[in-house]
């Protein structure tokens, strides 16, 4: 629901694995009428590429399932930066050693289909295949990369669900703001 509130996103697809452990995700998507693409559990880059290809996406916006409190305005901010031009990839954070200024759990990455296709064709490292877009930003000069920083710096805030404790906090937040 939160991603679909973006002013820029015209289509939403959940890209999950073809592992039977993720059948509940497929059931949830079917129940909600949300398109679902299933692909490799380990070659996530291939899953994203095949999904984007099947759905004929020109621009790919990647947010992850461990970010259920993602802010649609943050998604739009990164998309707008990408659409301004001058880059093949835009994100509001990169892995360390890069400094994070957006809260953990608001992670948004945007790239063109052409850049995703090049990554899919050329990424050969396991890490690049598993984490989808490192091929686009790991080698300076290979692609035009734009980092969308947050001011003031909110990089220490945490709105993700990676642990049981995170889940309990998320449930409490959702309960407090149920309406």
Label the model's feature ranges.
Residues 18-85:
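Short phosphate-binding loop-to-helix
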Residues 163:
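Short, conserved phosphate/pyrophosphate- and ester-handling motifs at nucleotide-, phospho-/glycolipid
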Residues 1-3, 29, 136-137:
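Hydrophobic C-terminal alpha-helix "anchor/cap" residues
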Residues 23, 32, 70-157, 168, ...:
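Conserved core of the sugar-phosphate nucleotidyltransferase
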Residues 1-21:
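N-terminal glycine-rich phosphate-binding loop and ensuing alpha1 helix
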Residues 175-179:
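Left-handed beta-helix
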Residues 10, 58, 88:
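Conserved acidic residues
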């Amino acid at each position: 629901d939160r991603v679909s509130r973006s002013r820029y996103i015209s289509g939403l697809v959940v890209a999950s694995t073809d592992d039977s452990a993720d059948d509940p995700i497929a059931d949830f998507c079917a129940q909600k009428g949300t398109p679902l693409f299933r692909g490799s559990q380990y070659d996530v880059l291939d899953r994203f590429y095949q999904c984007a290809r099947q759905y004929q996406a020109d621009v790919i916006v990647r947010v992850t399932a461990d970010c259920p409190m993602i802010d649609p305005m943050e998604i739009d901010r990164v998309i707008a930066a990408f659409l301004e031009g001058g880059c093949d990839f835009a994100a509001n954070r990169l892995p360390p050693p890069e400094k994070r200024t957006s809260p953990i759990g608001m992670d948004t990455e945007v790239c063109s289909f052409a850049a995703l296709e090049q990554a899919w064709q050329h990424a050969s490292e396991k890490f690049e295949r598993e984490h989808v877009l490192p091929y686009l930003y790991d080698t300076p000069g290979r692609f035009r990369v734009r980092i969308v920083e947050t001011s003031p710096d909110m990089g220490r805030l945490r709105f993700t669900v990676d642990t049981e404790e995170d889940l309990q906090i998320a449930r409490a937040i959702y309960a407090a703001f149920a309406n």
